[in-house]
Swiss-Prot record:
Source species, domain of life: Viruses
InterPro entries found in the cross-reference section: NPV_P10 (IPR008702)
Gene (name only): P10
GO cellular component: host cell cytoplasm; host cell nucleus; viral occlusion body
Keywords, in A-Z order: Host cytoplasm, Host nucleus, Late protein, Viral occlusion body
Functional description taken from the UniProt entry: Plays a role in the proper virion occlusion of the polyhedra. Forms extensive fibrillar structures in both host nucleus and cytoplasm. Involved in the liberation of polyhedra from infected insect cells.
Localization terms from the record: Host cytoplasm; Host nucleus
Pfam families: NPV_P10
Name used for this protein in its record: Protein p10
Species this protein is from: Autographa californica nuclear polyhedrosis virus
Length: 94
């Protein structure tokens, strides 16, 4: 049996190294895609923290929140209906 030529050994080592580099590059590309999904996470966490702090303040009575505009007209309408019913001497069924 003859020994493998030095150039053949070098070629085999380079081929094996190239295969390993390709595998690592594929893994890195996958990680890069995963990190891109996390780009907006700090802003989302900050927003969530702010909302949680506001909720905690409301629950402890530190602040009283303003009602959303979508609820204000309904409350005015309901108050008007209750007032009208009271003037007519009717009991509210609400």
């Amino acid at each position: 049996m003859s020994k493998p030529n030095v150039l053949t050994q070098i070629l085999d080592a380079v081929t094996e190294t190239n295969t390993k580099v390709d595998s690592v590059q594929t893994q890195l590309n996958g990680l890069e895609e995963s990190f891109q999904l996390l780009d907006g996470l700090p802003a989302q966490l900050t927003d969530l923290n702010t909302k949680i702090s506001e909720i905690q303040s409301i629950l402890t009575g530190d602040i009283v929140p303003d009602l959303p505009d979508s609820l204000k007209p309904k409350l005015k309408t309901q108050a008007f209906e209750l007032d009208s019913d009271a003037r007519r001497g009717k009991r509210s069924s609400k």
